[in-house]
Amino acid sequence: RGLGDVYKRQVYTDKVEAYYRKNISKKLAIEALKAVKAFYNGESFVDGTSGESLKTYIDFIVSKNNLSNIYLSQQINDKFNNSEQMLLQLNDNFVEQINGNLLQFLYTYDAIQEGVVKLKTDMLSVLSIAVDYVDADGD
């Protein structure tokens, strides 16, 4: 969020999550990532039980169709785990992080984007979900 236009190297620290309560930026980012990971893996927020999920459906489709990408579901989880590890290394205050060590913040952003690519291209392809330009918002 606080990166502004990454490709133009414009940084907007006032766009970080929890700008007015800066010491929880990292906590919110980690919780958001955990929520996406839990949804992907079919984990309940209420009692921690697991059920059917995008992961189990990917595994089913891959095995049913003898697809070569047998490790896709694990690759996606690996991206989630790597992103979380990268986030844990950041300052709790993303404004301070960006101003103090932008490069580390950008590496974390890149790690998260690798997961987005796995979800929005590889997973959708395996699940035979077509996305048109209106749905592809440029994440």
Ranges and model annotations:
Residues 73-139:
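C-terminal accessory extensions/subdomains outside the catalytic/core fold
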Residues 2-7:
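Short, small-residue-biased leader/transition segments that mark boundaries at the very start
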Residues 1, 17-20, 40, 126, ...:
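Generic detector of bulky aromatic hydrophobic side chains
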Residues 25, 29-35, 115, 119:
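Stable alpha-helical elements in mature extracytoplasmic
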Residues 33-102:
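An amphipathic alpha-helical core segment
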Residues 12-30:
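C-terminal catalytic subdomain
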